[in-house]
């Protein structure tokens, strides 16, 4: 229902009566997709020629928060901290009004016992076939949610292995991303945003440098050329414009922008420390 209301409202604002009809249609598709996932039917029409990009984006958005809700329950029950973490992620995405309510509803449905996790992930993988960077974004979103409280519970780790395997990632690939996200969490706590915006007024500590290297996926012994290659690879995989062109929902673009800023800050810190351009 909410999909139709939101679609009609924005459709009318953007396109008058015709836009209203189109908005109603797309909103109906969103509502139908959400019901199909929750009832165990998976993403109906996902990956087919009939499925338009708006529907796929809506389904990706729904799945992201529904799986996040399932992740929050991995410890056995959902605490106020998990709810706070989900709200913080919504804040990072600048979600307000109806978009935020849709995310909250998806998160809530993912917590329920009957949520079809593996069917949902299989359809996400099907829809993103040939778009490895979108699958990586989806996995990293769940890793960020798991790490957002500063620790990773064993049950969360086990569930992340299920998610990664379902999306086509190996255990080694997951563990690498877990290490990188743990470093990214520390890097964020160290205030890289303020440092990046202010031009690094103070020399970074040894720990900050170590985290910066790990954010890029290289060791401290890496040469300048290796650092540059790692940076270009990471930016190529996480560039917001490229992700948008491949179907990343607009609501999730802010997360992609923040990741790109994080990579840039880590690279700048290492570049200045090593003294290369």
From Swiss-Prot:
Keywords: Cell inner membrane, Cell membrane, Chaperone, Membrane, Transmembrane, Transmembrane helix. It is found in: Cell inner membrane. GO terms for molecular function: protein-folding chaperone binding. Residues 211-277 form the J domain. CDD domains: DnaJ (cd06257), terB_like_DjlA (cd07316). The transmembrane domain is a dimerization domain. This is Co-chaperone protein DjlA. It comes from Photobacterium profundum (strain SS9). The lineage of its organism: Bacteria, Pseudomonadati, Pseudomonadota, Gammaproteobacteria, Vibrionales.
């Amino acid at each position: 229902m909410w999909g139709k209301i939101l679609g009609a409202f924005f459709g009318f604002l953007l396109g008058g009566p015709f836009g209203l009809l189109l908005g109603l249609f797309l909103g109906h598709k969103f509502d139908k997709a959400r019901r199909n996932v929750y009832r165990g039917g998976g993403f109906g029409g996902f990956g087919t020629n009939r499925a338009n990009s708006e529907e796929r984006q809506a389904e990706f958005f729904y799945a992201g928060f529904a799986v996040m809700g399932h992740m929050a329950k991995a410890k056995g029950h959902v605490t106020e901290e998990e709810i706070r973490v989900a709200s913080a992620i919504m804040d990072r995405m600048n979600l307000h009004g109806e978009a935020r309510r849709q995310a909250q509803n998806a998160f809530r449905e993912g917590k329920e016992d009957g949520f079809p996790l593996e069917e949902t992930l299989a359809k996400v993988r099907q829809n993103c076939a040939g778009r490895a960077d979108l699958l990586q974004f989806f996995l990293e979103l769940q890793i960020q949610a798991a790490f957002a409280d500063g620790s990773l519970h064993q049950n969360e780790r086990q569930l992340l292995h299920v998610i990664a395997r379902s999306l086509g990632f190996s255990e080694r690939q997951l563990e690498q991303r877990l290490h990188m996200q743990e470093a990214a969490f520390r890097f964020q706590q160290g205030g890289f945003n303020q440092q990046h915006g202010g031009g690094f007024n103070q020399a970074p500590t040894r720990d900050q440098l170590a985290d910066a290297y790990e954010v890029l996926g290289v060791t401290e012994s890496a040469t300048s050329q290796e650092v540059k290659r790692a940076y270009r690879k990471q930016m190529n995989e996480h560039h917001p414009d490229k992700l948008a062109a491949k179907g990343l929902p607009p609501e999730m673009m802010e997360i992609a922008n923040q990741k790109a800023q994080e990579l840039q800050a880590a690279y700048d810190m290492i570049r200045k420390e090593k003294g290369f351009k």
